[in-house]
């Protein structure tokens, strides 16, 4: 299996390339309780239209082993830059889902030398009011492993039109997590502070699920309002919950393609 050594981390990744010269490179960061394969169908749609797509498992998720060292939004951002360095990619469009939707704007604000644009899919707006919920989640996983998450999230976190196969994949993603790694990534969200949204000067697309309870529309609108660039767009996906790329993959691909064409 393909791994990259990024500092002290061993990161499992995939690099999907189109035939011929790529129009642009995208790098994708998944969210809590997920893996690079959350994006698989989206990447195949984009590769078919000439884009290079890099996906990877966050440390402690999927096939990237947990290091037992605490992580943060900043260290996760460093991982993305490290992957780009290792693959000799000078600049890329960064895509982040959920927790990754905190990391992507952090990079857009602080590393615009490496970021072409940012796409935030169901981005979480860091909020102290969410801390008790994550503390309860950590306690449940410490006691019972990932089973409680797998028994609730696949139905609770999606929109009413989510296909059964999407729920099945969400369940598999959750059951496949290392509980210690999952807890570590919960703590990243607990400790997260809002990125410097006003500093962002690259184009930004936000995809918000109309029925998203994990990253509610109100928070997505708040992020949109705080983003500094005038080159920004908020798309509200009807009847979609928090797992956009599994619930409505074709729509996600079309929205990303449309946004990319607009910023050229």
Give the location of each predicted region.
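Conserved alpha/beta-hydrolase catalytic His-Asp/Glu region
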Residues: 128-132, 142-199
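Short alpha-helix in the alpha/beta-hydrolase fold that links the catalytic acid
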Residues: 202, 216-225
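Catalytic histidine neighborhood in serine/cysteine hydrolases
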Residues: 225-242
């Amino acid at each position: 299996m393909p791994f990259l050594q990024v500092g002290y981390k061993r990161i499992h990744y995939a690099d999907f390339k189109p035939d011929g010269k790529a129009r642009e490179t995208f790098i994708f960061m998944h969210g809590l309780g997920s893996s690079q394969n959350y994006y698989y169908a989206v990447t195949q749609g984009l590769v078919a239209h000439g884009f290079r797509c890099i996906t990877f498992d966050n440390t402690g998720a999927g096939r990237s082993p947990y290091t037992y060292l605490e992580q943060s939004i900043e260290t996760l951002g460093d991982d993305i830059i490290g992957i780009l360095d290792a693959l000799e990619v000078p600049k890329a469009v960064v895509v982040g889902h959920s927790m990754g939707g905190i990391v992507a704007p952090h990079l857009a604000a602080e590393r615009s030398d490496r970021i072409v644009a940012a796409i935030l899919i169901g981005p979480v707006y860091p909020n102290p009011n969410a801390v008790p919920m994550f503390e309860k989640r950590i306690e449940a996983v410490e006691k019972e492993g990932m089973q409680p998450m797998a028994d609730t999230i696949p139905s609770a976190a999606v929109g009413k039109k989510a296909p059964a196969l999407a729920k099945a994949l969400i369940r598999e993603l959750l059951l496949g997590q290392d509980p210690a790694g999952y807890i570590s990534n919960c703590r990243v969200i607990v400790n997260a502070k809002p990125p410097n949204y006003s500093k962002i000067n690259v184009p930004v697309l936000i995809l918000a699920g109309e029925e998203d309870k994990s990253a509610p529309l109100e928070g997505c609108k708040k992020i949109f309002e705080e983003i500094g660039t005038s080159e920004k767009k908020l798309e509200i996906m009807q009847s979609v919950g928090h797992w956009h790329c599994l619930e409505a993959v074709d729509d996600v691909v079309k929205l990303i393609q449309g946004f990319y064409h607009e910023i050229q």
